[in-house]
From Swiss-Prot:
Keywords: Cell membrane, Membrane, Transmembrane, Transmembrane helix. The keyword Glycoprotein does not apply. Its main location: membrane. It comes from Kineococcus radiotolerans (strain ATCC BAA-149 / DSM 14245 / SRS30216). Belongs to the UPF0182 family. This is UPF0182 protein Krad_1193. It comes from the Bacteria. InterPro entries: UPF0182 (IPR005372). GO terms for cellular component: extracellular region; plasma membrane.
Length: 1019
């Protein structure tokens, strides 16, 4: 038989080609991955180096690499060694049986792939082990740099630092080694069974000597690790809740007298059984270790489960108060210490509910500081009056800060940064050149007085406009780093960045970035690295990237601080301030632990979620869902809005957790003494810290163990009364509010963060929302370089006695809405269904010996350019409710014609929803023309007529005179029609504020030198 010479060569060639193709593809994929990963790491090195935090990055990186390597090697080796031993220790002559005959087929099928299977399984175990170990870099670093707390627990006499730093690392080591032994045991069992070293049936010994030594050794190692786990469980009882006393963390009576001894006994039994397995490894029988294992299981059930249950059921439950009080007291003390609540100043406040003339005379300094501007409502007013162009935007929720007044005092202010908004560009402007090299930054901070308004109900600004102007000496208004800057920008090298709109021929002033922020991107290598990092070829190809260019990325303040300090938990609200003529973002950082002995655990996400965090588009975020039982506001951070420079300051330098991190990253955190006075005066007590503390205080304001066990005096944070909740749903919590007020124990008003409390639902079956507590924390950090004010951080808690009945916020809001006078005014503000009424934040103030509620009411017409205007103010004291154009008038009405304290807004005219918005960005806007003035007069007259008609209607109904009632209703309809017509004329003739359509058109955008015009640039 003859064969064609080409016949056999073709399949061989195909096999060789297929065989060579697979490694080539694998190598190419590996090279691509390596290049991309290398580019990202290189970019990170440049980014951290530019900020001066390169040691932080390298320490974390190399520690993660080390842990990944060790973890991967350990688990991979455990699996590989067990599989290899199982194969090499296979018997030469396996007994003949049906079981072995069936396994022979599997052995034959597996043999060609045996080594590959070992490699794949070992690699999978290694990847799992490496990823788990790598994630514990913080645990290792804290243990390595641990410090003492200086106090010891009463149970084991161990320093608190042992539980916070050492115990988590030891527990991880034991659990990780246990996982390695378990995987090795599973692999060993499978290998020995497959290759005949372990049999389930047949005559004679069921294991070979080699299999017995291997498996018994692994069992002994597992039991020794289990013994270590039992021993550590004793200490972990200090940081967990056994459930014997609901919600109480730390050992209770049953834990101390039953669980702790049982853990020690089980640890001893596990060691004994481990020795029995060692004996089995050198002996010939599994009998003793099998008996020992059974004894361990029975002991775990009887000693570890049944005995503690019996002690709890028959000894503790009948005597709960006497036996558990000692341990509940330890939990109360430790929890208050862990959340920095040990020094809360508590006083009983028998609030007066009767209003009388002059009652607020002692609070004459507080009343003028009442903040009427609601930061969660007035964003649209800022946008319409100060937005200027569509590519500028303010946050949905604005911030509260303080600024000096000409008389040397301070005033609460609502602040917002005018940030870049690329979504506001027209479609034909959304090009790569425009978005990354032309529109690069926001401009200016807008500051409005918190306790005042303009004549038309819009905010009264003290710093505003473009170019910026005002009383606060803002010298560098450009915002290259802000909460809205989520894309990268390439700046420098060309004077073509749009700075702000002006009256020039092009319509815009331009600028060139000359700050130190960002990373150089002018060289070919730098372009390649960042092109790979962002997956954008334009960085490499565009002529807009010059040798002098710098790339700005990771630009939001929160992500910048989180990158340079990954060990911090960041507050959900960064706020802008003007410090030394520059815009600076201020953030708060927390050090936390979930291992503080005896302290109750808190879910950060739940505790910090409120009505603001659930508002769509809000810049205020809740903290991540994580359980902690220790928290400190240990760091204040700042981010320069122009350079992106990050500074970390040790705010609580007594915090042991911060001390450990400062040892781990020396030089990363500056001392408190480095904080300049100009920055200090803008630092405040953080919202999220207070939210967590107020959540803890709902239960831990009760310091008597017996009362704590009953739970009858627990509180809740009330729901936000301004949020409409559907039937059967729960309102989100009312957020805490920054207010300048004087607590009853204080001599002068202080900038504070406040909250209220109502009875817990399970402690108040009737569901009445009466007030039970009011808390305020001193938030004024002072203005002295490197020194916090003496009272900063002091929490003052007013507890209302059970005999005092003061309505809570939700009930007060219901009373306001059902009040006849308020309803009449709301109807006036909603004339012709062309307006909507918005209830602002309901503020609570402990003044006049009682509790005063103040709520601003905003009106907004339905026009495209309208915004909420502060139109009325409601004041409530006891059962007295008043609504007026000003707070001054409302207070006087509540307190019998004279409150005794002036609010300072007595001259404010009654604004309406239809007043047009100013166009020039200033508070007052241009003078209205005569037609507009006539319309305003006609609108006010119509509103007055409507008010009188409503009053006449009510009087006629009360008298039963339906003829007069019908006449009054006709006059009301006529007044409504007249008001609607006047409002329509105002909308047509009024000068409306800028909208997104005001953004630069294709023809008005400045061209890029050397490129096509900015309207249609191509990279």
């Amino acid at each position: 038989m003859s064969f064609s010479p080409r016949g056999p060569s073709r399949p061989v060639l195909r096999r060789r080609r297929r065989g060579a193709a697979l490694p080539t593809v694998v190598i190419l994929v590996a090279v691509v991955i390596a290049v991309v990963v290398g580019a990202r790491i290189t970019a990170d090195v440049w980014w951290f180096d530019q900020l001066g935090f390169l040691p932080t990055f390298t320490t974390k990186l190399w520690l993660q690499v080390l842990l990944f390597t060790l973890g991967a090697l350990l688990l991979a080796a455990a699996v590989a060694v067990s599989l290899t031993l199982g194969y090499r220790a296979r018997p030469i002559y396996a007994p003949v049986s049906d079981e072995q005959a069936g396994l022979d087929r599997y052995r034959e099928s597996l043999e060609p792939l045996r080594r590959l299977v070992v490699v794949v399984l070992s690699a999978a175990a290694g990847l799992f082990g490496g990823s788990v170990a790598m994630s514990r870099w913080e645990t290792l670093l804290l243990w390595w740099n641990r410090v003492d707390f200086g106090t010891r627990d009463e149970q084991f006499r161990m320093d608190q630092g042992f539980y916070v730093f050492t115990l988590p690392w030891l527990a991880f080591l034991v659990s990780f080694l246990t996982a390695a032994v378990v995987l090795a045991g599973i692999a060993g069992l499978a290998a020995h069974y497959l290759y005949g070293g372990l049999r389930l049936s047949g005559a004679g010994p069921r294991t070979t000597r080699a299999a017995r030594v291997h498996l018994a050794s692994l069992a002994a190692a597992f039991l020794l690790l289990r013994a270590a786990g039992y021993w550590l469980d004793r200490y972990e009882l200090m940081t967990t809740s056994s459930g014997y006393v609901r919600g109480v963390v730390g050992p209770t009576y049953t834990d101390v007298h039953a669980v702790l001894p049982s853990k020690a006994i089980l640890a001893l039994i596990a060691v004994v059984v481990a020795l029995l397995f060692v004996a089995a490894a050198v002996g010939t029988s599994w009998r003793l270790p099998a008996i020992g294992t059974g004894l361990l299981v029975v002991s775990a059930i009887a000693i570890g489960g049944i005995y503690p249950w019996a002690v709890q059921r028959f000894q503790v439950t009948p005597n709960r108060q006497s036996l558990e009080s000692e341990y509940v007291g330890k939990n109360i003390d430790a929890t208050r210490d862990a959340y920095d609540l040990s020094d809360v100043e508590v006083s009983t406040y028998a609030a007066d509910t009767t209003a009388s003339q002059g009652q607020l005379s002692e609070d004459a300094q507080t009343i003028p500081s009442v903040r009427l501007l609601d930061p969660s409502v007035v964003s649209q007013a800022f946008q319409q009056t100060q937005g200027q162009r569509g590519y500028y935007k303010f946050g949905e929720t604005l911030d509260v800060d303080r600024y000096a007044t000409p008389d040397g005092g301070t005033q609460d202010a609502v602040v917002a940064a005018r940030e870049l908004n690329l979504a506001g560009l027209a479609d034909n402007q959304r090009t790569w050149v425009n978005e990354h090299t032309i529109y690069t930054h926001g401009y200016g901070v807008v500051v409005a007085q918190g306790n005042d308004r303009a004549p038309d109900g819009s905010p009264s600004y003290v710093e505003a406009n473009v170019p910026t102007s005002g009383d606060l000496d803002l010298e560098q208004p450009r915002i290259y780093f802000g909460e809205g800057t989520t894309t990268y920008s390439i700046v420098g090298g060309r004077d073509n960045e749009i700075d702000y709109p002006d009256g020039s021929a092009g319509g815009f002033a331009t600028t060139e970035y000359d700050g130190s922020g960002g990373v150089a991107v002018g060289s070919l290598l730098q372009k390649l690295v960042y092109g790979l990092k962002f997956g954008d070829q334009n960085i490499l190809l565009s002529g807009s990237v010059t040798p002098e260019s710098r790339i700005l990325y990771d630009r939001t303040p929160r992500e910048r601080v989180e990158k340079v300090a990954p060990w911090l938990t960041m507050d959900g609200d960064a706020y802008p301030s003007i410090v030394d003529g520059r815009v600076v973002w201020i953030l708060d950082g927390y050090t936390t632990s979930n291992s503080y002995p005896y302290s109750a655990a808190t879910e950060l996400g739940d505790a910090t979620t409120d009505a603001l965090t659930q508002t769509q588009g809000s810049s205020v975020q809740a903290l991540q869902d994580r359980t902690v039982n220790y928290v400190r506001n240990s760091v204040k951070a700042t981010v320069d809005a122009y350079t992106g420079k990050v500074d970390l300051y040790a705010w609580d330098d007594t915090d042991p957790v911060l001390k450990a991190w400062m040892k781990a990253f020396p030089g990363a955190v500056e001392p408190l003494s480095a904080i300049d006075g100009s920055l200090m005066q803008h630092l405040r007590y953080p919202q999220d810290m207070f939210k967590v503390q107020r959540e803890v205080l709902t239960r831990y304001h009760v310091t008597d163990p017996a009362s704590f066990l009953t739970g009858q005096d627990f509180w809740d944070v009330p729901g936000d009364p301004t949020v409409d909740a559907a039937a059967g749903t729960v309102r989100p919590s009312q957020p805490p509010y920054y207010l300048t007020l004087r607590m009853p124990e204080q001599d002068t008003p202080t900038y504070s963060l406040t909250t209220t409390y109502v009875p817990a639902s399970n402690a108040n079956a009737s569901g009445t929302q009466v007030l039970r507590g009011f808390a305020a924390v001193d938030s004024d950090a002072g203005s002295t370089k490197g020194t916090k004010s003496e009272g900063y951080g002091t929490i003052r808690l007013l507890e209302l006695p059970q005999s005092t009945t003061v309505n809570g916020p939700v009930q007060i809001q219901n009373n306001i809405r059902s009040d006849t006078a308020v309803a009449d005014q709301v109807r006036l503000l909603s004339v012709g269904d062309n307006s909507r009424v918005i209830y602002g934040n309901l503020l609570t103030l402990p003044v006049g010996g009682g509790l005063l509620y103040v709520e601003p009411i905003y009106a907004q017409s339905t026009g495209d350019n309208s915004f909420p205007r502060l139109s009325r103010v409601v004041a409530v004291f006891g059962d007295n409710i008043a609504i007026a154009n000003t707070l001054d008038e409302a207070l006087d009405e509540v307190f019998g014609g004279n409150s005794g304290a002036g609010a300072g807004d007595e001259g404010a005219p009654p604004p309406t929803a239809g007043t047009p918005a100013p166009t020039d960005g200033a508070t007052g806007g241009p003078a209205p023309d005569p037609a507009t003035g006539d319309a305003q007069v006609q609108l006010q007259q119509a509103l007055d007529n409507a008010k009188r008609a409503i009053q006449d209607s009510s009087a006629a109904l009360a008298e039963g005179d339906f003829t007069k009632y019908g006449e009054a209703q006709q006059r009301l309809r006529a007044a409504v029609d007249a008001a609607s017509a006047a409002e329509a004329r105002l909308e047509r003739s009024g000068t409306s504020g800028p909208t997104s359509s005001s953004s630069p058109s294709a023809s008005s955008a400045p061209p890029v030198p050397g490129e096509t015009p900015a309207a249609t640039p191509t990279p």
